[in-house]
């Protein structure tokens, strides 16, 4: 990612993991 702030890096990483998991759950339902 583009941030130099480690806390923001962690938040972005967690957000991307959550989005990826939501996408998998959505695909499994369809």
Curated annotation (Swiss-Prot):
The keyword Ligase does not apply. InterPro entries: CRF. GO terms for cellular component: extracellular region. Transmembrane segments: none annotated. It comes from the Eukaryota. The modification Valine amide is found at residue 30. It is found in: Secreted. Keywords: Amidation, Hormone, Secreted. One of its GO terms (molecular function) is hormone activity. Belongs to the sauvagine/corticotropin-releasing factor/urotensin I family. Regulation of fluid secretion. May stimulate primary urine secretion by Malpighian tubules and causes a dose-dependent stimulation of cAMP levels in the tubules. This is Diuretic hormone 2. It comes from Hyles lineata (White-lined sphinx moth). The lineage of its organism: Eukaryota, Metazoa, Ecdysozoa, Arthropoda, Hexapoda.
């Amino acid at each position: 990612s583009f941030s130099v702030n480690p806390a923001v890096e962690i938040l972005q990483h967690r957000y991307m993991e959550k989005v990826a998991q939501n996408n998998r759950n959505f695909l499994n339902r369809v």
